[in-house]
């Protein structure tokens, strides 16, 4: 999410006025309320009430209320971020939730957003036309919103992939049936072929998508906002690498070897 918060922050300087569409009542494990201040005053923020089953999932898994990053400590970060979609031993609740998540909510639990969002945004765009639609995923359901909106309106659409879809490391841990796996691949292909442009976050993902579609696939890697790092950093004699994101047993950063 931070990726497009920062894009929205700097797009006005490039002559673009962003319109941000976001749920009015999302279900999240953690929130960073400081990010709202990053949205430029030129941007219009459009919200819509949605339904998603994640709240039910959290209760089933025994997870508590949403955690504000201001109060997040190292201890509860480890506790809250135990990811059942990896090689860890899972209890029956985790196994059941993974099976339901992978086979009933395709491509992800946010699929419940798609129809109401398309219906809402079609009406919005009739009164407030835009030059281009941009979706970012995961959740990959956001790309289904972009696909349907672009098909209905003819507006060019850019699909930004912050992670791959069916080649994501945890995809094989979802316990997919043959039918569900085929549907994932079919939806992924429809997004890649239906987009005006596809953006990948790494050369590897870019190459994978290029082999799958004739749609132009551009590369925009993750970066950082210099305003967030104004303080001078004193380096020591050690060589340090910071990895910000998931690093599971399935991940193999071959470039480092």
Locate the predicted segments by residue.
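N-terminal subdomain of nucleotide-sugar transferases
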Residues: 1-67, 217
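Conserved catalytic-core segment of nucleotide-activated headgroup transferases in glycan assembly
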Residues: 225-257
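Conserved nucleotide-sugar donor-binding subdomain of glycosyltransferases
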Residues: 64-132, 184
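Membrane-proximal helix-turn-helix segments that form the acceptor-binding/catalytic region
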Residues: 7, 14, 119, 141-144, ...
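An aromatic- and histidine-rich active-site surface loop
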Residues: 102-118, 133-153, 159-162, 167
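Carbohydrate-associated surface elements
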Residues: 204, 220-223, 235
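Charged active-site motifs of nucleotide-sugar-dependent glycosyltransferases
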Residues: 131-132, 140, 236-241
């Amino acid at each position: 999410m931070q990726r497009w918060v920062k894009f929205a922050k700097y797009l006005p300087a490039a002559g673009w006025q962003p319109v941000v569409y976001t749920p009015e009542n999302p279900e999240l494990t953690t929130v960073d309320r400081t990010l709202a201040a990053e949205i430029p005053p030129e941007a219009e923020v459009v919200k819509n009430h949605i339904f998603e089953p994640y709240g039910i999932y959290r209760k089933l898994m025994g997870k508590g209320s949403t955690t504000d990053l201001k109060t997040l400590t190292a201890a509860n970060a480890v506790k809250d971020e135990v990811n059942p979609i990896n090689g860890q031993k899972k209890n029956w609740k985790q196994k059941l939730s993974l099976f339901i998540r992978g086979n009933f909510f395709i491509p992800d639990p946010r699929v419940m957003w798609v129809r109401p969002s398309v219906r809402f945004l079609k009406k919005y765009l009739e009164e407030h036309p835009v030059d281009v639609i941009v979706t970012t995923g995961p959740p990959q359901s956001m790309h289904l919103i972009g696909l349907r909106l672009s098909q209905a309106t003819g507006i060019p659409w850019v699909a930004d992939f912050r992670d791959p879809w069916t080649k994501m490391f945890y995809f094989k841990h979802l316990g997919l049936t043959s039918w569900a796996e085929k549907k994932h691949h079919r939806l992924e292909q429809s997004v890649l072929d239906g987009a005006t442009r596809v953006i990948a976050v790494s050369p590897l993902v870019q190459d994978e998508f290029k082999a799958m579609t004739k749609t132009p696939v551009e590369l925009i890697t993750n970066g950082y906002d210099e305003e967030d790092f104004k303080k001078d950093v004193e380096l020591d004699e050690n060589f340090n690498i910071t990895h910000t994101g998931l690093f599971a047993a399935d991940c193999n950063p071959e470039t480092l070897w």
